[in-house]
C-alpha cells in the first residue's frame, strides 16, 4: 500500500515563514531566522551599546550591512566635508557612532561618501544584498520595501536590532494573509505611487493591521521592480508590517548581475528555488481586496494621513462625506492644519516646495519619470525650492550619465546628494511652518517634513508637473 502525500496550498507569506521557522513557543509566538539585517545611524547606537555592555559579538557578520541615510546632508559642499559637514550635533554624533561601531564590530558599511551609500531601502536591492526568499529586517518601518523581491521583510525596534545582531533570530507573531489584487491596465500618467495611494484610500491606514499583504494581479505582473518597491514600501501606511509580490521573470532579471547576487552554479540553484516563491493556486487568504486599474487616476493627499487622498481632478472632501464622527473630527483637524477648505479643488492648492526623493520614489525610474515632464520647462516663480535627491550614489551616478541632472538644473531644481532628505525632519532639509510641499515620500503626518509643514503625497511625475505650474495639475493633460 503506497503512502498518500497531501500537499496544502500555501501563500507566499506562509512559504517564507515556514522556511525560516526555528521554533514555536507556548505563547503563540515563534522564533524566526533572519537572513539579512540592514542598519543605519538612527536605530543602531543603543543596539551596539547593548552588545558591548553584554560583551557579545554579532552572531553572523556577513548578514549585516550598514549605511548612514537619515541624517546625512544632501548639499554638496557639506557632503564633501564628510561626517564633519553635518551641522546638527546630534545627527553628526549618530553618523560618527555608526562608523565607529561598524569598525569596532567589523560590520561592512557604505560610509557617507562611498558611491554605494544611500537610503538603506534603495541600497539593499540595488546591490543584490536583498535576494528573493530572504527574511529581511531593519530598524525602520519602511523595510517592507524589500518584499517586492519576494522577501519577508519588515521593520523592527532598537531592542530587536540588538537581538538580531546577537542571535540572528527574532521572536515574532505570525500575521494573517491579505491579497490585494489590481487587474486591468493603468492609464497614461498613472504610476505605482498612484496605485498604492488608491489602495490606502480604499482600505484605510488600519485596513492591513495584523496582515501580511501580497500584491497581485495584472497591474503588478506588468509593473517594474522599482514600481513594486514603491507599492511594498507603503504597505506600512496601509497598516501592514509586510508587503510582498511573488517572484517572476521581472524579479529574476532585476537581481541578475547585482554585485552581491549569486553567480554560476549557485545562480542556477537560486533561480530554481526562487521560481517557487509565489502563492499556490487555491492558497487561503484571510482577506481579499480588489481594485480595477481603470478606476485609478493620479492621486494627491490633501490631509494629515495617507488615507486622506483623492484624485487630482477632485476636491477636498466635505464633512458631509465623512463615514462617521471619528472621521469627521479627523478631517476637521486636517482642514485646519493644512489650511484648506472643504470642497476646495485640489488644483487650487498652491505650492511652496517640491521634493522628489525618499525610499518610496528615488530610484532611476522615478527620476526619469519626473525628468520627462520638466524637460525644456521652468519651475514656477512661486515655488521657493524644488529639490531632487537620488536614493543612492549609484542612482545619482546613473542619472548623471543619462543627463537627467542637467534637465533638472536647467528647469530650476536643485540636484542633491543621496539621503533621506526632506522625507522627515531629521536633517537640514525641512519645511517652514505653513509651507505646502508636493512630496514623493510616504507620510504626510503633522510636522513630518518640519514643524507646521504641510505635506502632499504624489508621484514623481505629479510632483514635477506641480513644480512647473506652482500648484497641482493633472499630469495627464499637462
UniProtKB/Swiss-Prot annotation:
This is 3-isopropylmalate dehydratase large subunit. Its EC number is 4.2.1.33. It comes from Psychrobacter sp. (strain PRwf-1). Its cofactor is [4Fe-4S] cluster. Belongs to the aconitase/IPM isomerase family. LeuC type 1 subfamily. CDD domains: IPMI. It is an enzyme of class 4 (lyase). Pfam families: Aconitase (PF00330). InterPro entries: 3-IsopropMal_deHydase_lsu (IPR004430), Acnase/IPM_dHydase_lsu_aba_1/3 (IPR015931), Acoase/IPM_deHydtase_lsu_aba (IPR001030), Aconitase_4Fe-4S_BS (IPR018136), Aconitase_4Fe-4S_dom (IPR036008), IPM_dehydratase_rel_enz (IPR050067), IPMI_cat (IPR033941). Binds 1 [4Fe-4S] cluster per subunit. [4Fe-4S] cluster binds at residues 359, 420, 423. The gene is leuC. Pathway: Amino-acid biosynthesis; L-leucine biosynthesis; L-leucine from 3-methyl-2-oxobutanoate: step 2/4. Catalyzes the isomerization between 2-isopropylmalate and 3-isopropylmalate, via the formation of 2-isopropylmaleate. One of its GO terms (biological process) is L-leucine biosynthetic process. One of its GO terms (molecular function) is 3-isopropylmalate dehydratase activity. Gene3D superfamilies: Aconitase, domain 3.
